[in-house]
Design a protein with these regions (language model features):
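N-terminal beta1-alpha1 cap of cysteine-dependent amidohydrolase-like domains
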Residues: 1-87, 98-102, 108-113, 150-152, ...
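Active-site metal-binding loops of divalent metal-dependent hydrolases
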Residues: 53-54, 91, 137, 198
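Active-site-proximal beta-strand elements of phosphoester/diester hydrolases
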Residues: 3, 131-135, 192-195
Length: 236
């Protein structure tokens, strides 16, 4: 499996994502610049990643300008053909702005930037809660009741905020997200978005590798051999 990590002006988690995928999980990574439009080197079993940061300075609205960047038209087409797409934090906001995922990410309920470890419960997961960092000012997931019910009915809620014991409730919700939603997918289950940063919890050196479980569960075929290739920015 091959990963393409998109770099927008203002991205600041692109290299974190590269390191997690390439060095911690042994996957092939290609860095993509926001002006790139050719994704013909990626097959539908590959994945394009929209990382965290402040794309285009988050002017107007988080992800609102990045949604119109040259590469996003290709990403939308890639997703429509069944290719895998992951958006983390600002990447999740971009996916919602692009209408690849429903809903919106609003200002945190406490009106403050939040940077801390939180706990996540995967839907249907009976294991322990995963500790994953968040770092956002606009991470409160919102959608109308009809959309929320459709997400629930379709099994599209993939992660919810929880407490350390894995109990989903107000105590574990850092930003006021409706129904404690931390991550969702589309109906065809090839586009995924989440506010927490799994790439920041993949290295033993950081004392937390819970993020590996998330990335592996979403994408990586455990039967395939690991590969390591150097990744560099292209077409800057």
């Amino acid at each position: 499996m091959k990963f393409g990590v998109v770099v927008f002006p203002g991205s600041n988690c692109d290299r974190d994502m590269q390191d997690a995928l390439q060095y911690d999980l042994g996957q092939e990574v290609i860095m993509l610049w926001h002006k790139d439009t050719d994704l013909s080197g990626f097959a539908t079993e590959d994945c394009i990643v929209l990382p965290g940061g402040f794309s285009y300075g988050d002017y107007l609205r988080c992800g609102a300008i990045a949604r119109f960047s040259p590469i996003m038209q290709s990403v939308i087409k890639f997703a429509g053909e069944g290719g895998k797409v992951l958006g983390v934090c600002n990447g999740f906001q971009i996916l919602c702005e692009s209408h690849l995922l429903p809903g919106a990410l609003l200002r945190n309920a406490n009106q403050q930037f939040i940077s801390k470890n939180v706990y996540l419960r995967g839907e249907g997961d009976q294991g322990r809660a995963l500790m994953i960092p968040v770092a956002h000012g606009e991470g409160r997931f919102y959608a109308d009741e009809k959309t929320l019910d459709e997400l629930e009915a379709g099994g599209q809620v993939i992660y919810r905020y929880a407490d350390e014991q894995g109990i989903v409730g107000a105590a574990g919700n850092p930003n006021g997200s409706l129904r404690n939603i931390a991550g969702i997918c589309n109906k065809t289950r090839n586009v995924f978005g989440m506010m927490p940063h799994p790439e920041r919890a993949c290295s033993e050196a950081l004392g937390n590798i819970d993020g590996r479980a998330i990335l592996k569960a979403l994408f990586i075929d455990k039967k395939q051999p690991s590969v390591r290739k150097e990744a560099g920015l292209v077409n800057i």
